[in-house]
């Protein structure tokens, strides 16, 4: 690619109108403003791990790829094809200060070329944004009972096809991807997509895709700085109730709630032996 594309700042005049006359681009401009206040565009430009180009004066700057993905996701998109469709929105490109947006093939190639180092750079930027936003938010709207709520969960995304990279037969017998996520307040501050067996420290059960909390300890360690200055409470489901996970949780949280609906057979047998007065 011989041409060079970047993102420029645009001077925008804000006008408040009734909802019957609101523009569809209003929310996108708000996203652009928040990203600018955080310093996202400068951060992306200064991150060498996000720029795999050999010739820096040619092609799309990394900030253009990030722009395409960010405004696709925040406009309801869920695929690289959706990001490509933004190229047809001339008014949006003008407002964002981009002359051209990459197609899905170019975005996919960029994601592959930045590799694990680039993914780590994006993760660091996301962590910093979450910390920045948490500290700017009104505490009354952010906290519940004076606590910042955290949530760890694994979502099983069922897939089908001859080959689906990263998928495995899960505990329910379905071919699925494991999407392990960690939330701090309203922000998803960390996530890993793929079979739990991908984790180098995963226990043996991960070989069968059954341990769906394998990434939790690493996520909690990476995101621990986000809880500074807050009283935090972590919620997790029964998949995180194994002893080594509880120890990890106790190290980072004074308050936590972990549901326990596995391996209850022995407990139910013991409970049945207790007299009725024990439950009154």
Question: Model-derived features: where do they sit?
Answer:
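Dynamic "connector" segments at or just before major functional cores
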Residues: 1-206, 212-228, 252
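An internal, acidic/charged active-site-proximal segment
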Residues: 201-280
